[in-house]
Amino acid sequence: MGHEDNEEFFKGRGAQVNTHNKFLKNKYVLEHIEGLDEPLLENTATQLFEETPKKIVSESNSPDLSHMYSINPYQGCEHGCIYCYARNTHEYYGFSAGLDFERKIIVKRNAPELLEQYFNKKNYKPVCILLSGNTDCYQPVERRLKITRSLLQLFLKYKNPVSIITKNNVILRDLDILTELAAMSLVHVNVSITSLNEQLRQKLEPRTVTATGRLAVIQKLTEKGIPCRVMAAPIIPGLNSNEVPSIIKAAAGRGALSAGFTIVRLNGSIGEIFTDWINKAFPDRAEKVLNMIKSCHDGKLNDSDFGRRMSGEGKIAESIHQMFKMACNRFMANREMPEFDYTLFVPKNGKQTSMF
């Protein structure tokens, strides 16, 4: 039984509850989010909040991350992916990691200005910067605000490498900039595909582009010479784990050069949000899926241990690893993403970077 049979399921959003913010003194957990008598939900439309940060490039020292530097022009994400690890960051802003994460979006309009300042630091050496480390830089609001596009114009101006991860076809709007970046080996695009099953996609990621649409993004980018990787992430044992080969095959058929994956982990409030969701969306297999996730993370839903937190361990995790490896060997043999060119960077003084 899916959520079609469950009257408690709130359609159009991922989270079914607004969980308690651990940073707030008074606890209030909102469970019946479509109740007509709930005064706190008079407006369920997406709201924008502006932040004016003093810096925009974040640095990570996590040993299991391939990108050490990232920019998040937005916090919160209207896509509503139920599993999103970035949900917990919303609590720092005084919001809930649940429904608030999907409908209260924080925008950083001064991000381009801050990036230009970053590039012009006296001792700056070019590094690949990820768009974005937390939430999708091409989520729906980007269509109107164009903050990501402005950032890409700066990456092109200074000829600094950039890696993008998205699940939205809004990226195709910026083909003009991306094509120029690709011609100089300055861009990689990672397209996230969690499931080819449209019914499952609608439950997991209610406001995202269909898998068919994302495959079309890979194909169109590839046709323009823009290198693409598919991210089959996250893999949720018992929900989409059987789709790993088909996702990689489909992406390879559209031109993807490589693939990656992660196994879901449910840290902080996400464990409560996901548990509530799966009991409403898939009550017939909720307990089994939760136990399978735990088996990949030392008996817990959450996992912060480097090396294991994103790849898991144990029999189920190992079977997923083997499935992924076999699919890559079969469908992506002799393919690889091109290297970035760091020698083209043009700082404020106009002199190109020397790597020697």
Question: Model-found features: residue ranges?
Answer:
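Flexible, acidic/Gly-rich N-terminal and inter-domain linker regions that tether
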Residues: 1-70, 339
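Conserved Radical SAM active-site core
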Residues: 39-75, 79-190, 194-202, 211-223
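Short, electropositive alpha-helical surface patch
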Residues: 145, 179-193, 240-257, 318-322
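Short, hinge-like loop/turn segments at secondary-structure boundaries
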Residues: 181-183, 207-208, 247-249, 276-280
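Surface-exposed cleft-lining segments at the edges of enzyme active sites
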Residues: 199-207, 233-235
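Conserved C-terminal portion of the radical SAM core fold
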Residues: 212-270, 288-296, 326-330
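Short glycine/threonine-rich loop-to-helix capping motif typified by GTGT followed
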Residues: 240-246, 273-276, 349-354
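C-terminal accessory regions of radical SAM enzymes
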Residues: 278-356
